[in-house]
Regions:
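ABC ATPase "signature
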Residues: 155-156, 164, 234
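Conserved ABC ATPase signature
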Residues: 8, 70-74, 78-80
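The conserved cystathionine-beta-synthase
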Residues: 196-228, 234-253
Length: 253
């Protein structure tokens, strides 16, 4: 990109990148169908082809039946769905989303996060998602980059950042996170014992929140198993209770 000419950058932007912003930036005089098809018209694609692709994107974001509505006739969440459909119409290789849900009320915001997770499970795009909400980042991301003063100070999985913050800033940034929803059984397990094979089993990747009630109720350790079913450790009810109560900020059981 640094070596590309202005013309090359325009072509890359038109054909390889999709973008969604906090403000929907829909053209008010165009219908939903026309808004979604608009970037394809900029590419010079014929009307029949661009409208066919626009219909596909509208169906993908569950706006069937609203093709001929204008933006003013849609709710905020529906308008953002139009923005998402428009950004995907060009079939981008990289999808940039800059605080796309920040302007929505909490209920609609969560609904749109769920919709994004569904779309990604279908599309398998490379997504760069910008947010100031760490809970949102944890829910959506495989990997998170935390920036301060324009500099990336740590990159890792949500679990990495919560369990092993690189700086005091990252530790403060993640301090109020519900750790039980982020940390896995692997993060809290201790070594396996001779009795581990006869214990209730939990997957190493399972989030603590998914089995916390069960292990506390049982008052017995659970065996932690890897992807192939082998026992790789043991997690105690006390370790889970300490996590839930905030007494244990470390990773050991």
């Amino acid at each position: 990109l640094l070596k590309a000419s202005e013309a090359e950058l325009i072509e890359i932007r038109r054909h390889k990148m999709g973008m969604v912003f906090q403000h929907f930036a829909l053209l008010p005089h165009l219908t939903v169908l026309e808004n979604v098809a608009f970037p394809l018209s900029i590419q010079g694609i014929g009307r029949a082809e661009r409208e066919a692709r626009a219909h596909q994107m509208i169906e993908l974001v569950s706006l069937n039946g609203r093709e001929h509505h204008f933006p003013s006739e849609l709710s905020g969440g529906q308008q953002q769905r139009v923005g998402i459909a428009r950004s995907l119409a060009v079939e981008p290789e990289i999808w940039f989303l800059d605080e796309p849900f920040s302007a929505l009320d909490p209920l609609i915001r969560r609904e749109m996060q769920t919709e994004l997770i569904r779309l990604q499970s279908v599309l398998k795009k490379t997504v760069v998602f910008i947010t100031h909400d760490f809970d949102e980042a944890i829910r959506l991301a495989d990997r998170i980059a935390i920036m301060k003063d324009g500099e990336v100070i740590q990159i890792g999985t949500p679990e990495d950042l919560v369990n092993n913050p690189a700086t005091a800033y990252v530790a403060e940034f993640t301090a109020d996170v519900n750790r039980a929803k982020v940390l896995s059984a692997r993060a809290l397990m201790g070594p396996a014992t001779a009795k581990s094979g006869g214990l209730e089993k939990v997957a190493a990747k399972a989030k603590i929140a998914s089995f916390a009630a069960a292990i506390v109720d049982s008052a017995k350790p659970f065996a932690v198993v890897g992807d192939t079913g082998e026992v790789i450790g043991e997690i105690s009810p006390r370790a889970v209770i300490n996590l839930l109560s905030g007494k244990d900020r470390g990773a050991g059981a």
